[in-house]
Amino acid sequence: MKELQITTGCLLLMVAAIGKTSAIYSMSETCEYTPDGFIADPNSCQSYGYCKNNQLVGTGKCPDGYLYNNKLGICDSPANVKCISDSKNACLHATDNSFVADPTNCNGYCYCSNKTATCTTCPEFQLFDSKQIKCVYALEKPECTADSICRLVPNAVYVGNPNECGEYISCFNGIGTEGRCASGYFNKQLGGCQTTNPCLASSPNPDIGLGVIENLADNNFVCQVNGGNPTEEKPVFISDGQTCMGYYKCTSRNGPGIWGKCPKGLHFNEGKCVTPFTFPCTFDRCGNLNREFVGAIRTECKNFLICKNETSQGMAYNYAKYIGLPCTDKNYPFFNEVSGTCEKTSPKSDTYKLCV
């Protein structure tokens, strides 16, 4: 049976750096991207933690002779647990002058000499295949032995690289690929890219998008300019021009436009509230949606936005579009907002109109 030791006070984010490109995460960092529940300790096959509200609130260790089975959430016989947690021991049982997978990084490998590991990484977009003993492209689905945060967090998330502040690791189907933001730096607190360096100062709290909490002000002129001839019986609804879900209600050409927004889960388009993916809104598409990911328009359905507090986080904004982050697996290049995942084929259809 597991014994849980509750921790109190501030939690220090400890990073174990073994070589320049290794990516060992503390349990505190793992909890930042993990729902409530138990997680494995990426630095110890015997240890585990408990996450609550994205914080590490407890730690524990299995009895001697047992290892933590993350799939079952129990302390289990070593025969039932596959765990490699320390790259410095990668060469202990390897043949001298040979190459082995870096157990902390899927696109890394180590050269073994006198039981000592010297680790490096494969070229960009490639992973190390421990069976073929060579670097191959991710679409070939190489066997990855890395016991990294991608083994412990939900699928299709981007996490910060603890050894290279401002860079990220994309996690898809348990496999992690290191990357850099084209627009600048990755902010691990916000889960997205930004132009300023988050490593120079404390990262800000996520901003809240327009109309998410506070209503926008009414508009005294919108009904005169765009309202046509509205009446109390036949009001006219006009986009607020700032959000995807907001509108102005006009009941008189001379009266003010009263701001309102669609019911949760809907966006406003051409006078009515509709399913969000049926039109390419050019404002923050996270608004009014209880989603972790939404599609980014004008990217041919190959990019997506990360949402927190109904607001896209840290994404580049350019030419009236949120660019977002790409699906990194070349075998699954298209993002589908309906399923919330990267898929093989484009979701474009007569009703799914984000692929513009």
UniProtKB/Swiss-Prot annotation:
InterPro entries: Chitin-bd_dom (IPR002557), Chitin-bd_dom_sf (IPR036508), Chitin_bind-dev_reg (IPR051940). The keyword Disulfide bond applies. Glycans are attached at N114, N309. Residues 28-85, 88-146, 147-201, 220-283, 286-355 form the Chitin-binding type-2 domain. It comes from Lucilia cuprina. GO terms for cellular component: extracellular region. SUPFAM superfamilies: Invertebrate chitin-binding proteins. Larval peritrophic membrane. This is Peritrophin-44. The keyword Membrane does not apply. Coiled coil: none annotated. Residues 1-23 form the signal peptide. May have roles in the maintenance of peritrophic membrane structure and in the determination of the porosity of the peritrophic membrane. May bind chitin or related oligosaccharide structures. PANTHER family: CHITIN BINDING PERITROPHIN-A, CHITIN-BINDING TYPE-2 DOMAIN-CONTAINING PROTEIN-RELATED.
